[in-house]
């Protein structure tokens, strides 16, 4: 059975295509304006559309349902093939940026005399890489370990000469010549980077470092790219000079011969085996046994070892902290954007299914799932959350790029470096809060929306299973979410306590504008009570600043009384989440209320305001206990929140299909049988399943058919189990 079906296509219960078409026709939301709002501008939206279309048309990047049946070995091989394909896209994107279409630009840029590659050279491919994460997360990570983690470790810690040598002359940022991995995590330490145990001992006689794994727990672990592909690694190790430990620094250590991929002397590497997901990434372990590297392979922007008798170590303690921020910021910032894009993909699938699927009611015209109030409550707030994320994710990325530009442009100017250090510390707090909150939200979204698709959501071919297994590592790597929330919460509490004590506290980001003495006093004195009525649009984000101030006040008083910061750790996690909600809602409001919203149609803007309200109402309801405990809202006001939310759901329902269409995701990118644009969920699903199954040599006859036949036809073989008569009698006791 193919598209030509024996089922009567006029039967309403079997016409999901018509139901989706009717839903699109019922809404007048301008999806192009919404897309521009989500992406930041019409120009950025056009580029996103162009790159998605390129990927959708490229079978080397996007795959059909067969993608979900690949073995681990096949995933590894397919991922390498895709990286090779992306390397060609990268070269072409640089040619477009430089308008040099018929030259070997990469070869020219690898020359020692070539100018430094600029951010504008890489801008198109940077955007492309964020979209790769939407299509194939393991591909994005395996390439990102090389370009982002290794690359940013060098950029953040290396001198200008080292940056140019490793990234440009050796070809790492072109995915050519060498391939990098990022060896920070150890078997015994993850989040506690300061206590990593791998050693880099300086040997004055040979002017080199000896890299050593002192014991089993110091084995580098979970290192993406290590098992099969990396030729070099940025290794985080303790700098030891003349017996003194100077803390963890970063070293470039060769692992393999790039021409043969054979391991170098003293390097032991293995695969860490199967994981929950992302098996296309060759995560491995690394041990070093007296591996020597030249002194120049230590990344020396902020810490230098000067040869001599005795050798000297020059450090900039304040600026050295930048290296810790720079290496991990890229991944955390990217994960916030990934949360938006990945969530958009699965919101689209579940929303389309909710309109096309019918169950119960009139047997001749069953009720669409989306018409049930409970289903609206399960699906539509998740869509609103993704909309809430978008402006905040774009702002965070812009702030990160701005900070990075300042950092790279500062050179050795200590004054400029000190200034950018303050910005990066605030960015570290902001990115930690948003990374944790958004990855948690998207993790919950994928599983909740899988359940809204019933049994069909459990099929691999509809995407949810692999997506969840691939996604949830985002809640752990590059900063465990709870640890990140504690770090962010502690920083916010420290700023709050300093302001209350009258100290001068530097605030670089508008998301922390509630940390002002006048506003704190206003909240404490009850001057913000009107906000709790949610009578104006700004109230929906400002309510979160009110609860943040009250929460911080409670934490500060508790720590003051018991002198135990750990006693408020649970509250600090909530503070970090609430700060993320405030930051995202504030930016959504600022963007939509500004002249730069790119939403000129009044009706479309009104729908977006409803989405904004729903996202805030949903979380107020979710954390109703905290709002009432801290007396931010009364029980009557909380009842009003719930009534508002239930009233707004059917209003958003009318526009939900067009709101998902506004993500501009091609079917090849969504890769879900029940999530296609046409809404033909049953035919698409059946055809995908039968097409994949057609590869079986004898459909319907399993390769273990003889085993089935034999045990079904067996005689009385009870005695073959070797169960004694005594044991048999005891079975009933």
Swiss-Prot record:
tRNA-binding as a keyword? no
Q: What Gene3D superfamilies does the entry give?
A: Acyl-CoA dehydrogenase/oxidase, N-terminal domain, Butyryl-CoA Dehydrogenase, subunit A, domain 2, Butyryl-CoA Dehydrogenase, subunit A, domain 3
What are the alphabetically sorted keywords of the record? Answer: FAD, Fatty acid metabolism, Flavoprotein, Lipid metabolism, Oxidoreductase, Peroxisome
Cofactor annotation? FAD
Q: Name one GO cellular component term.
A: peroxisome
The reaction(s) catalysed by this protein are: a 2,3-saturated acyl-CoA + O2 = a (2E)-enoyl-CoA + H2O2
Q: In which pathway does it act?
A: Lipid metabolism; peroxisomal fatty acid beta-oxidation
Entry's localization field: Peroxisome
Keyword hit for Lipid metabolism: yes
GO molecular function terms listed in the Swiss-Prot or TrEMBL record? acyl-CoA oxidase activity; FAD binding; fatty acid binding; flavin adenine dinucleotide binding
Enzyme Commission designation:
1.3.3.6
Example GO biological process: fatty acid beta-oxidation using acyl-CoA oxidase
Please state what class of enzyme this protein is. Answer: oxidoreductase
* Cited SUPFAM superfamilies: Acyl-CoA dehydrogenase C-terminal domain-like, Acyl-CoA dehydrogenase NM domain-like
State the family it belongs to: Belongs to the acyl-CoA oxidase family.
Name listed for the protein in its UniProt record: Acyl-coenzyme A oxidase
| Gene that encodes the chain | POX1
